[in-house]
Amino acid sequence: MIIFLDPHCVEYSSAGHPERPERIIRAVPLLKERHPTWEWRQPRAANDAELLRAHSRKHIEFIAKTAEDFDLDTPAHPNIDKYSRKSAGAAIEAARAALGGERAFSLMRPPGHHATRNRAMGFCYFSNIAIATLDALENGANRVAIWDFDAHHGNGTEEIVARNPNIAFASIHQSPAYPGTGLTSFANIDNYPVAPGMPRSEHVDVAERALQKLLQFKPDLLLVSAGFDAYSGDPLVQMTLEQEDFASLGEWLCKIDIPTAAVLEGGYSDELPELIDAFLTAWDPSS
């Protein structure tokens, strides 16, 4: 397993904001202690050409220059352009590592799956997973599948990749919940809205059905928007998954013979480090 991490990604914060540095700070020592053989790499920043595959130049410039918050959830932190480019770069590098035969996980912030082509929102500035997907298609992959099991709909990813015949996207998310999208499926987009409080077993079944549908696409690469906010103890939604359920998601990845990389999205409970570890350990049980 290769973990992509830039330690500077913990340098920004807002008082009381759930997308806080501790999400990473507490996960790093736990993973390093339990998995001493895993490789840790610092990512590079995504460049303009890579960002422009998913975003308009106006959006890229706005992220770099604005001093006003993008919305109530998405502050204009000092240097957020720098941190967001590193997070996008980590997703790109993780996808490329997967195409090279490695298992790879981007342990970075900010997350990305709510960022649309022209808008930062929902704690997200650049669409990391979409940027990585489009980069992969430019660098050897012919078909890429995206499996998003974050508790919130990946609306930004959907907007950017919709109707691209070389991409299949599936999102399993609570509904109703932020951002209020993802109710219908179309073209290359499969949405799986689940009700608040859905029994664990039913939620897991939906996630597996979504993954199996993606595998029918016969992708050269599977990218995972790994959000851990469907956990029963997460403060932002009302879902029911437990630690062992995230292990099940990882076990499924372990069993498929497709290059795979995952990117951290949400997850705001104090148990996030344990949830990440359960998922990664099941995905790479030899470590």
What are these regions (language model features)?
Residues S56-F62, E242-Q243, L272-S287:
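Short, electropositive alpha-helical surface patch
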Residues I258-G266:
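Short acidic/histidine-rich active-site segments
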Residues D229-A230, G267-E271:
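Divalent-metal (often Zn2+) His-rich catalytic cores of metallo-beta-lactamase-fold enzymes
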Residues T37-E39, A168, P259:
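Conserved beta-strand segments of alpha/beta enzyme cores
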Residues P43, F149, L264:
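Small/polar loops that bind or transfer phosphate-bearing groups
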Residues M1-T133, N142, P193:
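Metal-dependent C-N hydrolase catalytic cores
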Residues S14, I92, R96, S106-K255, ...:
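Conserved alpha-helical scaffold segments that buttress catalytic/binding sites
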